Amino acid sequence: MIDGKYTADYLWQEKGIVPILKIDKGLAEEKNHVKLMKPIPNLAETLKHAVEDRHIFGTKERSVIYDYDEQGIRDVIAQQFDIALQVWNAGAVAIIEPEVDIHNPHKAESEAFMLEVINEHLAKLDSDVKVMFKLTIPTVNNLYTGLMKDPHVVRVVALSGGYSQDEACHLLSLNHGMIASFSRAFAQDLRYQQSDEEFDATVKAAIAKIYAASIA
């Protein structure tokens, strides 16, 4: 707790930060050039507690696509949407995160096919269902512009995926409407040896750079 409030309540009420809960339990072994999520035990109970008792707004769940493989990509997206519907039915909004590895030798083709499959699943959703997406910055600029306009989609955010901070920000700036959800790139210059002043200055500089790329 923080100042007598549960963390999620403090984040939203005091800081205006939407609370998100990571619910996946890591990645399964690679098959068909992808890694699905491992089974998530007691998901229904976790979601009920998160939403009703802790006021969590959304969830995050990650899988990875390493190469172009239609069956693998279909499996990833099917699993993501299955979990997303369970999250929605529990009263929260899922962040669907099918990361396309930046070293994928057929990254552009994988992203294009993934988008086709995503659109197939979106078309089957009831009109009231909402989801978010956290995606690798695409090889083809503005690939996800149409996805952002889908009425089911609350937001499309970008993961840094192993790109350096400079490169991630540059690539993001070329994709209008995508905003950063960087962790690796955000933290790349932080060191435990830094003084409080150095740490704070590094954080502020990263935020400024990433924010500028998000609104470009």
Regions found by a protein language model. Give the residues of each.
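Alpha/beta catalytic barrel-like cores
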Residues: 1-57, 65-68, 117-135, 139-216
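Eukaryote-skewed repeat-based solenoidal scaffolds used as protein-protein interaction platforms
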Residues: 59-137
